[in-house]
Amino acid sequence: MAIGSLSSLGLGSKVLNYDVIDKLKDADEKALIAPLDKKMEQNVEKQKALVEIKTLLSSLKGPVKTLSDYSTYISRKSNVTGDALSASVGAGVPIQDIKVDVQNLAQGDINELGAKFSSRDDIFSQVDTTLKFYTQNKDYAVDIKAGMTLGDVAQSITDATNGEVMGIVMKTGGNDPYQLMVNTKNTGEDNRVYFGSHLQSTLTNKNALSLGLDGAGKSELSLNLKGADGSMHEVPIMLELPESASIKQKNAAIQKAMEQALENDPNFKDLIANGDISIDTLHGGESLIINDRRGGNIEVKGSKAKELGFSQTTTQESDLLKSARTIKEGKLEGVVSLNGQKLDLSALTKESNTSEENTDAIIQAINAKEGLNAFKNAEGKLVINSKTGMLTIKGEDALGKASLKDLGLSAGMVQSYEASQDTLFMSKNLQKASDSQFTYNGVSITRPTNEVNDVISGVNITLEQTTEPNKPAIISVSRDNQAIIDSLKEFVKAYNELIPKLDEDTRYDADTKIAGIFNGVGDIRAIRSSLNNVFSYSVHTDNGVESLMKYGLSLDDKGVMSLDEAKLSSALNSNPKATQDFFYGSDSKDMGGREIHQEGIFSKFNQVIANLIDGGNAKLKIYEDSLDRDAKSLTKDKENAQELLKTRYNIMAERFAAYDSQISKANQKFNSVQMMIDQAAAKKN
């Protein structure tokens, strides 16, 4: 032991040394520190053991909570006959057999678009153009630039629709195996893709419907469309419908009347047959759509057009080209050509001209050219249209090429959708998007998907294939007792793991005087008896005595719980309501008509366990907190005791050093006197 600078302690006395101090200190540490260390070790052991008990109680609480939950007793399972569908059912669904006839599955739209290519990196188009289509109540115009590859176009379609419509490059085989596919992500008739132009109606008129000739002898409703010869033709529509017809029935009748009228006209017969012109109902039959995938103009004419819900009676043509910027002010140089017709910019503009003056002069010059039309839009930019739907822009000389930028134009060729349709945008519908159609216990139902979860609450159906006539798929809904059985098995297992631990930690052997770590802790000693008191709970009913023994649960003479599954299953199947009342609880009314809930046995188990481990006021939580406080207090007491001993033996060492110094001085004096005596004696001799 080394304290301060007292390194020579004991040299004077040969007695007051560090060995003496260490022996004294060891004795004090055994008296003061050792008991605290032992208490701290016991505290740690108790905390570890308490964690184990709480963990075991939590394991017991899992199945107890399930068995004290009402939904466990109304759990259902389903069994499906046939391969037409799969089904799942939620808790509380009435026990029944559901017959489902599947006529059609919901499908997405699948289309081939354009020619085939040798590689996905092949150039799709040599001209600037726009792919136009309509789906899900929205019009899309996908810009396709000259030089874009097949893969680029596919990605542009997907990006423009945020993935609702997917451009896919599919390898189909052959010399040119790559084909652009345009498919919808989702199923249902409202996901159909209509290329080109379209008009849509929303019929709200519930009155009787008569389509014929008006007083002037004109058709009250007619379609004006581009025929197979490229010219516009008007086709009258005739129809009589009673007031009793629904909106859906009226739209279906109008659709049929329009199709028949077009099929009977030689200008449209083939166009209807090959799908270039189509008429469909959408939104569950509430809406009608007329589509020309060639992109031609569509017009609904006649006095009844608005009455039939056509708020817009003619398609609006898109402009072919809009300049990228307003035309530059001042004098412009060079010659440019539009469809081969030249414009001398130096002759059309002046140094003093504003941008607007230059624009007006150039528009006037363009409008004087054959087959071209130009105007200035609200942004002040140049807009050019061509009668043919095609526009070739060139700079005829070096100055003209440079001036194209000042006009907001680029050299190249631009085509409208209609002009590009027969070369770039030939489309073929391979699968038409449609709703699922099925009967549910005889009731006809349509849905946009094959996942059906809104017919009856809690019944979820996935349609997978159609059924044969008069051979419906049958969903058998029955009671599911498996959760009860599984939870009781878990309960038995958790109980049999908990009890031995409680016995070990609370035991006392009178012969050996050995006690468990929690032998004196009343709250822990009481756990087993509290659980066993609930286990022995019984109720007298009209059906006899209800107890856990009736359901196959028993305790042997060693306190080990067991479960007779056969007995349990028999009790569950014979009277499920009695099981629910005994396990979960039952409701009744008192004399005053007030609702009273009688707790079931597992609700009682749940309460016992909750009082032990749930929340800040739980018994074991309070005991755990007391152990934490004891641990902190013991740590503090040990620190104080160690500081006390340190101070005590520092002082003792200093005192020993002082005593030792005094003894050393006395020894020196004694030695001097002794020397003098010895010298005197020597002289006498």
From Swiss-Prot:
Subunit architecture: Homopentamer.
One Gene Ontology biological process: bacterial-type flagellum-dependent cell motility
One of the record's GO cellular component terms: extracellular region
Source organism (scientific name): Helicobacter pylori (strain J99 / ATCC 700824) (Campylobacter pylori J99)
Described purpose of this protein according to its UniProt entry: Required for the morphogenesis and for the elongation of the flagellar filament by facilitating polymerization of the flagellin monomers at the tip of growing filament. Forms a capping structure, which prevents flagellin subunits (transported through the central channel of the flagellum) from leaking out without polymerization at the distal end. Essential to colonize and establish infection in gastric mucosa as a result of its essential role in motility.
TM spans (from-to): none
Protein name: Flagellar hook-associated protein 2
Family named by the database record: Belongs to the FliD family.
Top-rank taxon: Bacteria
